[in-house]
Amino acid sequence: MSTATKPSALAFDLQARCSTSKARASTLHLPHGPVDLPMFMPVATQASLKGLTPEQLEETGCRLCLNNTYHLGLKPGQAVLDAIGGAHKLQGWNYNILTDSGGFQMVSLLKLAKITEEGVRFLSPHDGSPMLLTPEHSMSLQNSIGSDIMMQLDDVIQTTSPDHARMKEAMERSVRWLDRCIAAHKYPEKQNLFCIIQGGLDLEMRKQCCLEMIKRDTPGIAIGGLSGGEAKSDFCKVVDTCTDLLPENKPRYIMGIGYPEDIVVAVALGADMFDCVWPTRTARFGNAITSQGVLNLKHARYARDFGPVEHDCTCTCCRSKEDGGLGITRAYIYHLAAKETVGAHLLTMHNVHHLLSLMRRARQAILEDRYPEFAQDFFARYFADKATPQWAIDALQGVGIEL
């Protein structure tokens, strides 16, 4: 085990704590600029956010996005990344990048992937040849990508798996693989390696993993293995259990969540960072995320609705032309949705802006010590025409917020 503190390319400035819940406001200082937390990271899988240029992504206020190590390792490949000088230059992005380790994609996307102590064995999707992703190779790829935050290779299995022995093996292997990642990481003074807490829905296993990961003193800590079909009540218990144990002076990242209600609850439970493909993916199906819930603008009821996608939204899509925006209407999105990709692009612009705006408002509420009121107002609006989920009521009640 490597316990010595290594150089870090990260500074974490904790600025406020909610006096009722566990919500926190902070600033993360990274090599490509500061990032205010809590925050949502859009997912630019292949060094591109589907439907947005880097300039349009910048306009949403995004200062940290996610790239996928597995996909970039396949194409353009490590040699091209080394030649151009990393993913920032490849995609023309001047701000921060977080990369996942690539392991999750191999296990979830590829047939016949097999995990051993050595690494993840799989067949190349290009020519079917056998390949191996080890912790060392994952670090090498992420060093070539040049991401500001890089994730350890971990052993990921479905949270709902009934195989307790396999879950324990995955948790313990993730700790061992972290040690290998730390040893293989070439540029700790330029890139920040985050550990990933595993353990399924077993709270004792999660506690054990937290304690082991904390000993390794990585610049930040992720809670992984969630959003895998588990009940939301179980998800909340895992997050609550982990954040109780995690150090106050490090950022906390929950991997793979993007529904607004999940994020508002997770912030109350003490988490800082989130990512998910859902806001961009759902845009491609004609869905707009709004403060009143998700609107499917492919529905005929919007054919003569000449209002903006969301009233009072300040994104480029929704702002009037007089205010420097595009002045796009719901009727126009309805007209485009079935035939033209530009409709998906416009909704992507809106949805990403909406999530980032939600995070900015959450942060401001924490700074002003009114996060309980913020959460109450969010749920009253978002679920105005339907019942608030019981899991959210229970989770927030557990940290002193009554809905």
Whereabouts are the PLM-identified features?
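Glycine-rich phosphate/ribose-binding loops and adjacent secondary-structure elements
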Residues: 2-3, 172-175, 184, 188-310
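Alpha-helical packing segments of well-folded alpha/beta enzyme cores
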Residues: 138, 170, 174-177, 181, ...
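Non-catalytic, usually N-terminal nucleic-acid engagement modules in DNA/RNA processing proteins
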Residues: 1-187, 295, 300-303
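C-terminal extensions of enzymes
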Residues: 2-29, 35-44, 48-51, 154-161, ...
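Short acidic/polar active-site loop segments enriched in Thr and Asp
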Residues: 63, 148, 219, 272, ...
